Amino acid sequence: MTASDRVVCACRDKLLIMQTSRCLLAILNLTILTVLSCYVARADEKRLMKAVVAHDYGAPDVLKFENVTQPEPKEDEALVRVIASSVNPADPLTLSGKYAKEWGTHLPLIPGYDIAGIVEKTGAKITRLKKGDAVYGYPTFGGGWAEFVNVKEWEVAAKPKSLTFAEAAAVPLCALTAWQSLVTTAHIQDRQTVLVHGGSGGVGSFAVQIAKARGARVIATASTANQDFLKQLGADVAIDYTKTKFEEVAKDVDAVLDPVGKETLARSYDVVKKGGIVVSLVARPDVAELEKRALHGASMWVHPNTGDLTEIARLIDAGKIKPIVTQVLPLSEAITAERQAETHHTRGKVVLRIADEPKRSNL
């Protein structure tokens, strides 16, 4: 082989090596891109969650069960993995768009003002909560009908230890409403008398129990079918509003809790003693009627409060308050649950199961 032949062979070998290297590099790059794409896809998949979403205002039929992006907590928020939520009278109002201006809510929206779950992640400014904590509470702007929701620290408290997550999810909004109406606003004390309208409903069932826990005498109204239920809750006097006018039985009460409004509210002023109070959840008590009888009045607007939730949990664990769960449905059946809520004749609460109950016994 001549010198020129050896040069040609060497050049060919170098060219072959270069071509092989380029092919290997291309294969390596393709492999890296494929791995990265799979990793990103998996990461994106992890950031998705199941939720019930409304893209329009309207009836329960606007709700859709779909995949949405999992929220990331801000520095003053905690991410909660939701085990259960429940249905409230506020949900149809939210879906109707009633709160859009007052609360600044925007579409699409996820309903759900009750949650019970486990803290998954905390923001830098969260000091009380930590990952793994079992909590229950009331997210101010909803979002509970999903696998994850962000909450402020003051919107949740430690879950009552004696309750399952499904039971705990039936508590926050309705129990807070009853507590802030009777304890914070009306200052119910031992041996006072309280009239609770709609005593078998979500708020009413808690109101009867809270008033009894405070040592009050309780008169409650409900339909014929719920008379025994009122007694089970602890009501001293049960009135069947379909047969008897409540003002024929209730006299000189210290406080009235009204979740009905209209005629029921208008007739309630006459049964309250001088200096007593009428608390309405749906309307502003008539100032002229109050002044004429020397009464106090309040229109109730519930808000999340860790202290109140903690006190409610204490009474629950002491056996003085018990949530009434009438039905547990999977999250995918939220439309069915919402239709039941719109009837306003549900006894206690309907719960939405979002995940299985954790097996840890200390939660």
What are these regions (language model features)?
Residues G104, P108, K121, G137-G198:
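NAD(P)H dinucleotide-binding glycine-rich loop of Rossmann-like/cofactor-binding domains
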Residues P259-I321, I354-L363:
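Glycine-rich phosphate-binding loop and adjacent beta-alpha segment
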Residues R47, L309-L363:
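C-terminal hydrophobic helical "lid"/dimerization subdomain
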Residues A169-D240:
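Mid-domain Rossmann-like dinucleotide-binding core that forms the NAD(H)/NADP(H) cofactor-binding site
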Residues T69-V87, Y99-G142:
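Glycine-rich beta-strand-centered segment in the early N-terminal region that forms part
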